[in-house]
């Protein structure tokens, strides 16, 4: 089991939660990005730098993730792909993607893309709140407990 992070867009506060969790759970944490990242020294934490380009990091995560892994991403198409491979997907706000919710999320994403392409100002997501951080940490722990029960 490995925790993969779509690190280019992952908020630093979420990375900090993940660093602590990797140590506590003693699980590999791999941050995939197209730029150099600073991470704390740990035998569980490493970075994987990929070439710059559209979806390069996403494609690498999809290529390497396995059943039972967890992928941290706000990228809905990436979440859909890793779910198909048997991995779990969690966004930085603590929403766990599932087969039931991913289609709805993809449809909404496509709709918003269409609006933006037609010139409508849609705005971006709200800032990450303390409640979002707590929800993320709780969902991460929930995933870990589910994995432990399956052993």
Swiss-Prot record:
<comment type="similarity">
    <text>Belongs to the UPF0178 family.</text>
</comment>
<dbReference type="Pfam" id="PF02639">
    <property type="entry name" value="DUF188"/>
</dbReference>
<dbReference type="InterPro" id="IPR003791">
    <property type="entry name" value="UPF0178"/>
</dbReference>
<protein>
    <recommendedName>
        <fullName>UPF0178 protein YaiI</fullName>
    </recommendedName>
</protein>
């Amino acid at each position: 089991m490995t925790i993969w992070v779509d690190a280019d867009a992952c908020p630093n506060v979420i990375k900090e939660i993940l660093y602590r969790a990797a140590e506590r759970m003693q699980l590999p944490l791999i941050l995939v990005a197209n730029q150099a990242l600073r991470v704390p020294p740990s035998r569980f934490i490493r970075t994987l730098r990929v070439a710059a380009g559209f979806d390069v990091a996403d494609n690498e995560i999809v290529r390497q993730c396995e059943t039972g892994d967890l992928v941290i991403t706000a990228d809905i198409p990436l979440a859909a792909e890793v779910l198909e491979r048997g991995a779990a997907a969690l966004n930085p706000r603590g929403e766990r993607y599932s087969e039931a919710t991913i289609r709805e999320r993809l449809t909404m994403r496509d709709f918003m893309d269409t609006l933006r392409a037609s010139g409508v100002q849609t705005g971006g997501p709200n800032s990450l709140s303390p409640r979002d951080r707590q929800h993320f940490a709780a969902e991460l722990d929930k995933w870990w407990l589910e994995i432990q029960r399956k052993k």
